[in-house]
Structure formats: structure tokens, C-alpha cells
Curated annotation (Swiss-Prot):
GO terms for biological process: intraciliary retrograde transport; intraciliary transport involved in cilium assembly; motile cilium assembly. Residues 399-411 have a biased composition (Low complexity). It comes from the Eukaryota. It is found in: Cytoplasm, Cytoskeleton, Flagellum basal body; Cell projection, Cilium, Flagellum membrane; Cytoplasm. This is Cytoplasmic dynein 2 light intermediate chain 1. It comes from Chlamydomonas reinhardtii (Chlamydomonas smithii). Keywords: Cell membrane, Cell projection, Cilium, Cilium biogenesis/degradation, Cytoplasm, Cytoskeleton, Developmental protein, Dynein, Flagellum, Membrane, Microtubule, Motor protein. Induction: Up-regulated upon flagellum biogenesis. The cytoplasmic dynein complex 2 is probably composed by a DHC1B homodimer and a number of D1BLIC light intermediate chains. Interacts with FAP133, FLA10 and LC8. Functions as a motor for intraflagellar retrograde transport. Functions in flagellar biogenesis. The gene is D1BLIC. Belongs to the dynein light intermediate chain family. GO terms for cellular component: cytoplasm; cytoplasmic dynein complex; dynein complex; intraciliary transport particle; microtubule; motile cilium; plasma membrane.
Length: 427
């Protein structure tokens, strides 16, 4: 077998056999911009409860397994490796998190300085927003909530770079724009996040028998939001096993999703993904739209025929979506409600452990109340002290004695100093 050819003028520093030189050449190639030698990837699976995040992640990691994993409560971590081209090379590593549990917990993760789209992660970050087609009214609130969380966290992370005068945020945005939208007529209108964003609409098998008009509105809304935010859109079904009469279709959808994720995680946006499945925008079947394929004109708008702002188009689609799927507002209100309690599933309950936990929770709540009361008392004390200082300053300025000070003794009419009271009677 012949060794890889060297380019003219390339210096090889490693002495020894031709294979040692070939290895050095391969390593140098990996260090070049756009080569496969990337840093670790960081991937997050987020979305509503019971949307199938755990199942989808399990099928991505183990495509041939149709096991039903336990529901996730909190955040779960796993990783994936890509085999290296040579035995001596470092394998590409992807850190993968699934964010589950309550909405309040999810917000804690999103707002953490150590997790979710940190400065270290944004260059190779992938976010998969999982929405549940078997709960149509919850699709739009879930999707808009997580899109907003991604944008908010990226904004704060990018701001840290920009304050230091670094151009990385703009470079990431331009990378996404040039690789995915270079030939798209909406390239200057789309929000380019700079990261890989995927919208995975699961449980299509529970939605596919809906009225065609219902399916049309759902597909158009998802396509509009995906295109507006530079995201990939994939319908998925049969994740627990092939659904009746749709085994080949389910397998093709999963295979396409797996190929897409492997590319985004281990290659990234340095190269445009090449997928085996052709884009599918027919609402009568499962939708699959790569980022950069759609246009606002193709998606259309309910009233204004594609004219106007992106926000205006979203408002029109939202209005139609709410009419088609009652309960959207209630879902949003539930998602935005604070103080959601962590609920322990029945099969995991243990009386002694739960009692100890409840005591700890109560102690924590009491401690927080005491801390809040102490802070409030300190604020009141500071305000009172400030008011007294202001009063004293005002009296001093007016020439009046400050509170607690003795007034000077008045002189007698003839100018002699006042006599002190005699203490003789007391002696």
C-alpha cells in the first residue's frame, strides 16, 4: 500500500520510515481550518415532558435497539465517540445531555454558567428541540419557549466574547450563513444562531391520521419557525418499534436523523450536511426540511402572501394555530408558572428517604425565608440611617441644632455671661 502523497514543498520533520512521515502529514492536515480535527462536541436534547427525548437519544446512540428507557427527571449525561482514522489518533468525543424534569429545573440549567451553550461549547454546539405531535396544542409553546431560551443564552455568551473585542460570534453566524444559506433568497432575513439547531417532531405515527388541513397548519408553522431560525426540521415516528404498515418509512426517518446528527456533532457546520433522504415538504406525509432548503415564499402566510416582517408572519401563523389547536394559551401559562414542584414517580417512592428529603426541603425553605427577612431588615435599617443623616444635614444647613445636641446658653441683656445654677441648696 502506498503512503499518502505529500504536496510539493511540504517539510516533514519526523525522521524514520515513510509511515512515520505519513502519520505526521495526516496530523498536520487535521490541524488545518475546516479539517476534521475539531474539539469536543456538546449536544443538548431539550423539550417538553413525555415528548420522547430519552427514546430518541437512545435510538440515535443505538439505532438497532427499540428499548423504552425510563423517563428522565433532571439532567442526564452520556457521550459518544467517533472511531479515528488511525489507531494513534484521538477519537472525536461528543458530550450529550438530556434536560428533563420540571420547567423550573430546566431554567436553572439554561441559566447556569457551567452548562448549556457556554463560551467553551458554542463552536461545536448542537441543540435538539423535541416536540410531541401527539400533543398538538403543546407543540408551539414548547418550540417557542426553547427557541427563545437558546437565543437568550447565546446572546449572553456572545456578549462575553464581544466585550473582549473577539469576533468569534460573528464568525459563527457567518459560518452558518455561508454553509447553509449561501444560495437562499432569505439569507439576510433568517436569524443565524451560529450553532446547529434541530427541531425533532416525534410521535408522527399518533398524528398522521389527522385531517389534512390540520396536518397542513402544523407543518407550515413548524417549517416557518425552523426556517426563520436556521434550523433543521425532522418528523419521527415508531421510535418504540416499527408502527403498523410504516416500518420502512419509520426506519428511513430515523436513519436520516441519525446521519444528520452524526454530521452536526462530528463534522459540524464547516461542511453542509449531505443527507440520504430528499427534502419532504408535502404535509400529507412526514416532513423533513434541511436548514437552508425552505423559503418564506414557499411556506407562505395565512393572510399577507409572504410579505411583511418575520415576526408578523409568525403572529399570523400563531393565530391560525391557536384556532386549529385549542389549549395553546393554557399550555403556555402552565409552562411560565413558577414554583413547579418536583414529583416523584410512584415506583421510586420510599417513605424514609422521602421523609428525610421533605425535612431538608422544609429546612431549605425556612432558611430562604430567614435570609430574605434578614435582607429586608438590613434594607430598612440602611434606609432609616440614610434618612437620619439627611435630616441632620438639612438642620445643619439651616443652622438648627441637630437632634440630641444642646442649644447654646443665651447671654443676659447687659452682655454678661449667664450665671450657672447654684448647687448650694443641694449641699
Amino acid at each position: 500500500m502506498a503512503a499518502p502523497a505529500m504536496l510539493p514543498g511540504q517539510a516533514v520533520k519526523t525522521p524514520g520510515s515513510i509511515w512515520a512521515k505519513a502519520i505526521e502529514h495526516a496530523n498536520e492536515e487535521r490541524k488545518k481550518p475546516g479539517a476534521d480535527g475539531r474539539g469536543d462536541a456538546f449536544c443538548y436534547f431539550v423539550g417538553s415532558r413525555a415528548a420522547g427525548k430519552s427514546t430518541l437519544l437512545n435510538r440515535f446512540l443505538y439505532p438497532t435497539r427499540a428499548e423504552v428507557p425510563k423517563p428522565s427527571e433532571g439532567i442526564e449525561y452520556t457521550y459518544a465517540r467517533k472511531p479515528a482514522a488511525f489507531d494513534h489518533e484521538k477519537k472525536d468525543l461528543a458530550h450529550i445531555w438530556e434536560v428533563g424534569g420540571s420547567q423550573e429545573f430546566a431554567e436553572e440549567i439554561v441559566n447556569s454558567d457551567q452548562l448549556f451553550l457556554t463560551a467553551k461549547q458554542v463552536t461545536t454546539a448542537v441543540v435538539v428541540i423535541v416536540v410531541d405531535l401527539s400533543d398538538p396544542a403543546g407543540v408551539l409553546p414548547t418550540l417557542l419557549y426553547w427557541v427563545e431560551q437558546v437565543k437568550k443564552k447565546l446572546g449572553s455568551t456572545y456578549e462575553k466574547f464581544e466585550k473582549k473585542g473577539l469576533q468569534l460570534p460573528e464568525q459563527l453566524r457567518q459560518r452558518a450563513k455561508s454553509k447553509l444559506y449561501s444560495a437562499n433568497e432569505d439569507k439576510d432575513t433568517v436569524y443565524h444562531s451560529g450553532i446547529s439547531l434541530v427541531i425533532a417532531a416525534t410521535k408522527y405515527d399518533a398524528f398522521k391520521n389527522q385531517d389534512p388541513e390540520v396536518k397542513k397548519v402544523m407543518s407550515r408553522v413548524l417549517r416557518y419557525i425552523a426556517h426563520a431560525h436556521g434550523a433543521f426540521l425532522c418528523y419521527l415516528s415508531g421510535l418504540h418499534g416499527a408502527s403498523e404498515g410504516s416500518g420502512a418509512e419509520d426506519a428511513a426517518l430515523l436513519d436520516n436523523f441519525t446521519r444528520l446528527m452524526n454530521h452536526l456533532i462530528f463534522t459540524g457546520l464547516e461542511k453542509k450536511p449531505v443527507l440520504k433522504m430528499q427534502p419532504q415538504i408535502d404535509h400529507t406525509g412526514p416532513i423533513m426540511v434541511p436548514a437552508g432548503f425552505d423559503t418564506f415564499k414557499s411556506v407562505g402566510r395565512p393572510r399577507s402572501q409572504g410579505e411583511g416582517t418575520v415576526a408578523g408572519g409568525l403572529a399570523e401563523w400563531r393565530e391560525l394555530f391557536e384556532k386549529m389547536f385549542p389549549g395553546v394559551r393554557e399550555k403556555e401559562a402552565k409552562m411560565s408558572a413558577k414554583g413547579a414542584k418536583f414529583v416523584i414517580p410512584e415506583q421510586y417512592k420510599e417513605e424514609e428517604v422521602d421523609a428525610v428529603r421533605q425535612r431538608k426541603v422544609t429546612d431549605l425553605e425556612n432558611f430562604r425565608k430567614e435570609q430574605a427577612a434578614a435582607v429586608e431588615a438590613a434594607k430598612k435599617k440602611a434606609l432609616m440611617a440614610k434618612a437620619q443623616q439627611a435630616e441632620a444635614a438639612a438642620k445643619k444647613k439651616a443652622g438648627a441644632p441637630a437632634a440630641g445636641a444642646k442649644a447654646p446658653a443665651k447671654a443676659s441683656p447687659n452682655g454678661t455671661p449667664p450665671r450657672r445654677p447654684s448647687n448650694a441648696g443641694n449641699q
